[in-house]
Structure formats: C-alpha cells, structure tokens
Amino acid sequence: MDASSADPTCDRRVAAARAAFDEGRTRDHLWRSRQLAGLIRLIDAHEEDIVKALGRDLGKPRAEALTAEAWLVRAEARETSRSFRRWARPRSVRTPLSLFPGASRIVPEPRGVALIMGAWNYPFLLTLSPLIGALGAGCAAVVKPSEQAPATADLLAELLPRYLDPEAVQVVQGDADGAARLLEQRFDLILYTGGARVGRLVMAAAARHLTPVILELGGKSPALVHDSADIAEAARRIAWGKSLNAGQTCTAPDYVLAPRGRMDAFLEAYGAALARFHGDDAAASPDYGRILNRRHFDRLSAYLGDGRVVIGGRTDPANLFIEPTVLVEAPGDAPVMQEEIFGPILPLIPYDSWDEALAFVRARDKPLAAYAFGRDRDAIDRVERDISAGAFCGNDVILQQTVPDLPFGGVGASGMGAYHGRAGFDAFSHAKAVLRRPVRFDSGLRFPPHPEGKLRRLRSFF
C-alpha cells in the first residue's frame, strides 16, 4: 500500500500534530510543563480506572498496576517536569583559535512529530513513559496504544485528549493493519516497544522516510548465580522478577545459570519464595496475574514439554493461568531455550565454572538485561564487563528500570536507542550544532589565493 491509500483518519491526526508543532507552541517551556502536569493530574484523578483497565486486559493485580505502571509514570512525569528546563539549556563548547572571535554551542531542539507505539504487557507505562520524554523535549506526538490491551487503549484514548493538548497529542487506535497504515506517514522519530519481528517491519517502514527509530525489543535476559551468592536471597529476588506480571516483562530473567552443586538449594529456595508470595495455590493469589490471551497461553504451555518440570507446571486455559514453573534438563536447541519466553516459566541450567557460564551467555544474542548474584565482587564485575546487554543489575532483577537517571534500551538484537528520564529527553531532541561569528572581523586567511606563506600561517592552526 502506498501513502495515497492510507487511512484518512491517520492523515488527519498526523496533520493535526504536525500543525501544532509547526505553530511553535510545543517548544514553549510553559506548554511542556502544563502537559506534564496534565499527566500527573490524569493519574491522580483516574487511579482506580487505570487499575480496572489493567485488570481487564491482563488480570494485573492492584499492587502491580500501581507500583509497576501508574506510579512509575507519575514519578517520571514529576522528575521530567522538574528537570527539562535544565536539560534544554544550550551547552557551550570550545571554539578553535582559527575561528576567533566566535562562540560555539550545542542547542537541544525538539525533533518534531513523534510516533509512539506502545506495548501490551505494560500498556500504561510503556505508552506514557516515552510520551513523557517527547513532551519534555517539546515534541508533538501521535500515540498508538497496543490493540492487544483494549481496555487500557480505550482509557488512554478517552483521557489523553482531556488532560493534554488534544491537537499536539493525538491518539490513534487500530489493529496491525491500522498500524501499518500509520507507518506510511512521515514522522520525525518512531519509538516502538514490542517483538523483534514487528520491530523489523517498523524499521523498514521508517527507512522509506529516513526516519530515525528507537526499538525496545527484548530477548533472553540471563540470571547468573555465582557460588558465592546468598542462594535463598537470589532465588527470592529472581522468583519475584519472574512472577511479576506473570513473567510478561521484557527484562524478566529468562533463564538461570546456577552452580551444579547448588541446584537443589536454589530449587528449594525458589519454591519457598513462591509459597511465601502466593501460598499453595497461585491461581487463588490476589498478587498473581494472568496471561494476555489464548494464543500466548498456548505458546507458553508448549514450552512445558521442553524440559522436566520440577516446580509448578499447572495450567488453566479457561482462566489463562500458568503457574510459576521451573524446568530442568531443557536441551539447548529446544524452543524454550531459543525463543524469548515472556511468561512464568524458568529454565534452570547447571554450570561447572564461571567461565563456562559466561561463555554460555556470550554465545547467544545480546539481551535486554543481564543479572548476576554473588558476594564475589570480581565475579560480578566480570559479568558487568564481559556480557554485552542493554542493562546490568547486580544482586537483583528489573529494578534498574526504576532508577530515574538510568536509560532504558537494548543493544544488538534486543533493540536500539534508549529513553527514560534524561535519556528520554535526549532521544526526542536533536543536538543542533551552532556557531556564531561577528560580521566585521575576519582574518581572511581562508580566502584564496593561497601562496605558500599563507599556507604556512594556516598550518599553525591545525
């Protein structure tokens, strides 16, 4: 389909956002501040609506909906509101003597109209967190919530025009075909969160207009447990990260590498942690979510046959429930070890040396995050230094995403670009190079003719 056949609704919404940006209103610092304040008011006024929508879409527990979505967005909006003026200040840089008198600086300017394509697993957080970066940078935005989380998408479509500038921030809903039509439009930046297959389609569509992209994808994030680790605490934190949102977190630990001699201790501690979190029946726990839909449920259920189930394994298709599960003896070529799991199933793999564990991870695609547990600082330092990943967290999981000043992004197959906090402002800004020189003074050395004496003088500047 070429651009001439695109959905006219998409045309109108993108054109409205473009007109608002071209008018110049989004560059104004007061406008930016008001939009960020509007997001905070939206959350404060509709906290329960957000919780209900996330519950309908994902069976997300109330505590998760608040602490891992709504309140994180609120905190980031508040931090950006406090800081964007400082981030937006021009930065002076050294000007060579050959250009004296002159002044050089780097000026952040908004990229323009951004397309933000949200994800279904955290449909509130992963749609509005990048929007915060866009608003702080002074961009207009077209927001495309995930159609796979329809209750949250409907809520965003209802509330964003009420609390934000309804011309500069447009919400477009639709399925995959609608998203494809939207991608035919010209944007100044596209940010997509989701899987690698669609990420490639987004990048190909962006290439038609030479539009820069930020791709937040995923991958198989490893958790390496060193022999020096507190096994009980490592298991507890990994169990929390793997159970959060029923494992449907892009930075959740995908598999665990543990010393062969401590496998049983890890399994015992992991099972005990799950029992403390959710009791004897996770299906009855108010703090455990559900799988998004039947397609993902069936995909995850198939993984249960890729190894031997030693913890969990129960499923209920009628309620889209999969119990927190640990697999052992999963072959390296099994789908559960080749594909991002994105669910509460955890392969546990033994190793005989730390070198072997690191080599296992390095032989695979670069993950969105890497985790290491241990008291041996040198061993943990090696993982941070030698494993290329979007992020690293020592002795915990996932929490690096909650640090306001840390960027969130992948590397290699796990994505490109980053946002969150200052990184979000920078992502939606262009660093414009500026040189100002006086009208009257000029040495004339650069102008022809260039006899040898003049060249010798010029050489002294290089």
Residue map of PLM features:
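Residues at or immediately preceding the N-termini of alpha-helices
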Residues: 10, 29, 47, 231, ...
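Structural signal for hydrophobic packing residues in well-ordered secondary-structure cores
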Residues: 21, 25, 40-43, 47, ...
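Conserved C-terminal structural/oligomerization subdomain of aldehyde/semialdehyde dehydrogenase
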Residues: 2, 27-28, 224, 322-462
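Rossmann-like NAD(P) dinucleotide-binding subdomain of oxidoreductase/dehydrogenase enzymes
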Residues: 96-233
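Short glycine-enriched loop/turn motifs at secondary-structure junctions
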Residues: 183-184, 217-219, 249-251, 284-285, ...
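Residue-level signal for inorganic ion chemistry
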Residues: 32, 77, 138, 169, ...
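N-terminal Rossmann-like NAD(P)+-binding subdomain of aldehyde/semialdehyde dehydrogenases
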Residues: 1-105
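ALDH superfamily catalytic-core signature
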Residues: 164, 197-331, 394, 454-456, ...
